[in-house]
Amino acid sequence: VPETSWKTCTPETAPEFAAVAYYFAKNLHKDLNIPIGIIQLPVGGTTVEAWTSRKLLLSDKDFRPIIERYDSIADAYQSGEYEKIYDRYIKSLAEYNKLSAEKKQYIGKPTEPMGKWNFRRPVGLSETMLNVVSPYTLKGFIFYQGESNTARGAQYRKLFPAMIKEWRASWGQGDIPFLFVQLPRFETKTRYWLSLIHISEPTRLRR
């Protein structure tokens, strides 16, 4: 990987690690007494479809609308509509900032327009980060994601295991371990959060 190298974990470099990855490696090193290397791709606020390929999303009728809807919206950005959409976003953001200063409770932040350049788009991280590191030999994966899919729990139940299967196939190392974190409770009134926690349970049992 260009301009990238292994770094020894020290008090100076430790803050660069994702917390889950750091403590996982620390405990593994303690148990095995061997060097533990971590290739981390820490990107917060992502959906599971950002980590899957276009081929996978198009292969299933339940996933296909994700990529088709995104392509339709992104094409509109390229056809001269983006400036109008972005202007609306800026105005909404200004109103959000004003209301946030006046109120203590959470106010929904407007969603920034997401064109084809945005790495958080569907398939975005699969086409960038994953493609760069997939040649590396691994002992397994650790994965912490799901908050951004809480409103689509039923779809996540099917797409997440499909993503796991695709990752294993991409690395070509057989049924290597895939460990993931069940989402903790979060200070929110939405019913979707607990739903996604429950949905992850069958996946955990199958793995």
Locate the predicted segments by residue.
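Metal/cofactor- and membrane transport-associated sequence elements
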Residues: 1-137, 178
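Secondary-structure transition/capping motifs at alpha-helix termini
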Residues: 30-34, 166-176, 204
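Solvent-exposed loop/turn segments at secondary-structure junctions
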Residues: 42-48, 147-151, 183-188
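Short glycine/threonine-rich loop-to-helix capping motif typified by GTGT followed
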Residues: 55, 151-156, 186-194
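Alpha-helical scaffolding within the catalytic cores
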Residues: 119-132, 158-166, 192-196
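Aromatic- and acid-rich polysaccharide-binding/catalytic face
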Residues: 134-151
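Active-site segments of SGNH/GDSL-like serine hydrolases
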Residues: 173-193
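Single conserved hydrophobic/aromatic residue that forms the stacking wall/gate
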Residues: 197-207
